[in-house]
A protein has these predicted regions:
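The feature captures the beta-strand-to-loop junction immediately N-terminal to the Walker
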Residues: 35-37
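Helix-to-loop junction immediately C-terminal to a conserved catalytic motif
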Residues: 50
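Conserved ABC transporter NBD signature motif
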Residues: 58-66
Length: 367
C-alpha cells in the first residue's frame, strides 16, 4: 500500500488548459473517486499519475518519493481501463499472468499467483477460455486480475464499468468495493457516474473544467456541498435551488422565496456564514428532494409550505413529485404510498436543519 500526494499539478496542451493547480492527498489504503462531467480533466489526471501523460507543472509523489520523472513501469502502479485491453489470442490464465512473464517470474510462481487471483475474483473456471468467449463482466474481472497479480502499490481504474449494462454495473460496483476491502490497496477510480462515486469511495474529488471543486467524504460532498455545481452534480434527482432574497425581520434574517409569499427563517446552523449577508442580497435556497415531509403535522425542525402537484413519478420504493411553488419547480421524494394526486395542493415541510444557502452571484455555499 502507499500514500499519494498531488501538488499544484497543471496540464496544458498548447494554449488550452486542462488541469489547473490540482492538490490532492490520498492516504494509504484510501479509495479516491475522481468524478465530474466529460472533459473535466479526471482521466488526464489519472494518466498523469500513471505516467502516461507528462504534467506541465507541479509534482506527484508516492510514499514521499517524487515520481513525475519516472517511467510508468517504475511507479509500481497497475491500471484497469474501460476497454479491458485483453490480448484476444491468449487464454484468461495467460492474460492474467502476462505482467509476471514480463518480470521473468518462474512458471510455478505465475501459476500460483494466477490461481490465487482467480479464486479471489471467482473466475477460476474461466482460465482456459479466450476473451471473446467471455461476457463483459467476466472480461472486466480478468482485467482486474491482471492488475491484481502484480501486487502494485496503487490501483488506477479509468471508467471500468462504462461498457456494462445497468444491472452488471451494480454487480461489478459491489465486487470492486468488496475487492478493495480485502486487499486494502490505495485506489484511484475515475467515473462520470455520481452514484458510483457515492457508493464506492472513501473520499471523492468533484472536478469541473480542470479544477477540483470539492474534496471530502461522500457524506461531506452530499450534505455539505461547497458550491452549486457540486450541489446539483452530486445526487439524483439533483438538489433544488430556489431563488430567494435575504430579508431581515425582528432582528433576524429570513429568506423570501422569489415570486412567492413564502418567508423562511435563516437555518440556525448557517448563522455564522449568514452574518455576512446583506438585506436584499439574492441567494439560492438549497433543498435535497428527501429533505421534505408531506403533511400538515411537522416536527420543530421543519417549516411548512404549500404547493401544487404538477407531475408524479413512481419508482417502486419511492414516489417523486414535481411540485409547483409559485414560478418554481420543486422535486420532492415521498413514500411510495403517499396520497397525492396531480393538480391538487399539498402541505409539505422543509427540514431547516439540513437546508443550505448559496450566494447567487458566486455559487459559493454560505456556511
Amino acid at each position: 500500500m502507499a500514500s499519494l500526494k498531488i501538488e499544484n499539478v497543471s496540464k496544458r496542451f498548447g494554449s488550452v488548459g486542462i488541469l489547473s493547480d490540482v492538490n490532492l492527498s490520498i492516504d494509504d489504503g484510501d479509495f479516491l473517486v475522481l468524478v465530474g462531467p466529460s472533459g473535466c480533466g479526471k482521466s488526464t489526471l489519472l494518466n498523469i499519475v500513471a505516467g502516461l501523460e507528462p504534467l506541465s507543472s507541479g509534482s506527484i509523489s508516492i510514499d514521499g518519493r517524487s515520481v513525475q520523472n519516472l517511467e510508468p513501469k517504475e511507479r509500481d502502479i497497475a491500471m484497469v481501463f474501460q476497454s479491458y485491453a485483453l490480448y484476444p489470442s491468449m487464454s484468461v490464465a495467460k492474460n492474467i499472468a502476462f505482467p509476471l512473464r514480463m518480470r521473468r517470474q518462474s512458471a510455478q510462481e505465475q501459476a500460483q499467483k494466477v490461481r490465487q487471483v482467480s479464486e479471489l475474483l471467482q473466475i477460476g473456471h474461466l482460465l482456459e477460455r479466450k476473451p471473446q468467449q467471455l461476457s463483459g463482466g467476466q472480461r472486466q474481472r480478468v482485467a482486474m486480475g491482471r492488475a491484481l497479480v502484480r501486487d502494485p502499490k496503487i490501483f488506477l481504474f479509468d471508467e471500468p464499468l462504462s461498457n456494462l449494462d445497468a444491472k452488471l454495473r451494480v454487480d461489478m460496483r459491489t465486487e470492486i468495493k468488496r475487492l478493495h476491502q480485502r486487499v486494502r490497496k490505495t485506489t484511484i477510480y475515475v467515473t462520470h457516474d455520481q452514484i458510483e462515486a457515492m457508493t464506492m469511495a472513501s473520499h471523492i474529488a468533484v472536478m469541473k473544467d480542470g479544477v477540483v471543486q470539492q474534496f471530502g467524504t461522500p457524506s461531506d460532498i452530499y450534505d455539505r456541498p461547497e458550491n452549486t455545481f457540486v450541489a446539483t452534480f452530486m445526487g439524483s434527482p439533483s438538489m433544488n435551488l430556489l431563488p430567494a432574497t435575504v430579508q431581515p425581520a425582528g432582528g433576524k434574517l429570513n429568506l423570501r422565496i422569489d415570486g412567492t409569499d413564502a418567508l423562511i427563517r435563516m437555518p440556525a446552523h448557517l448563522a455564522r456564514g449568514a452574518a455576512a449577508l446583506k438585506a436584499g442580497q439574492p441567494v439560492l435556497f438549497g433543498l435535497r428532494p428527501e429533505w421534505f415531509l408531506c403533511g400538515a403535522a411537522l416536527p420543530d425542525t421543519h417549516v411548512g409550505l404549500r404547493a401544487a402537484v404538477d407531475v408524479l413519478e413512481p419508482t417502486g420504493p419511492d414516489l417523486y413529485a414535481a411540485l409547483r411553488l409559485g414560478p418554481h419547480e420543486v422535486m420532492v421524494r415521498l413514500p411510495a404510498d403517499a396520497r397525492v394526486c396531480v393538480g391538487s395542493d399539498v402541505d409539505f415541510g422543509v427540514d431547516l436543519s439540513k437546508a443550505l444557502v448559496f450566494d447567487r452571484a458566486t455559487g459559493v455555499s454560505v456556511q
